[in-house]
Design a protein with these regions (language model features):
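Conserved, structured core segments of small domains
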Residues: 1-123
């Protein structure tokens, strides 16, 4: 099952973990076949939030909500179950300084013909 491990850190701790330590963690997970993707994010000040309300788009600088910890990166992993995903998350280096939110992903289940109709109507 796929799990998204969201890395949260306070701004003052964004550089508490050396890039090489995170890369070593990712390489180990990749070699084990458990890592599907991983990326660090730029600071929250570079975020842009997009909203569609009543058919109108608004774009604002910054994140959706103010928070002490900010989303600093993610690891998309393939684990047997939540327990294994938690064990993997505990080994992600920034866990020592912030938090790792572990969330299962879900598959989108739709009829392919319905997707084609929707895509045709949108273009």
């Amino acid at each position: 099952m796929k799990y998204l491990c969201l890395v949260y850190l306070e701004a003052s701790k964004l550089h508490a973990v050396a890039d090489r330590e995170c890369m070593a963690c990712g390489d180990g997970l990749r070699h084990s076949g458990m890592l599907l993707a991983a990326e660090p994010l730029h600071p929250v000040e570079t975020a842009t939030t997009v909203r569609i309300r009543n058919g109108a788009m608004t774009v604002t600088d910054g994140p959706f909500a103010e928070t002490k910890e900010q989303l600093a990166g993610f690891y998309l992993i393939d684990a047997r179950d939540l327990n294994e995903a938690i064990q993997i998350a505990a080994k992600i280096p920034p866990a020592k300084y912030g938090s790792i939110e572990v969330r299962p992903t879900r598959e989108l289940v739709v009829d392919p013909a319905e997707v084609e109709r929707y895509a045709a109507a949108a273009s």
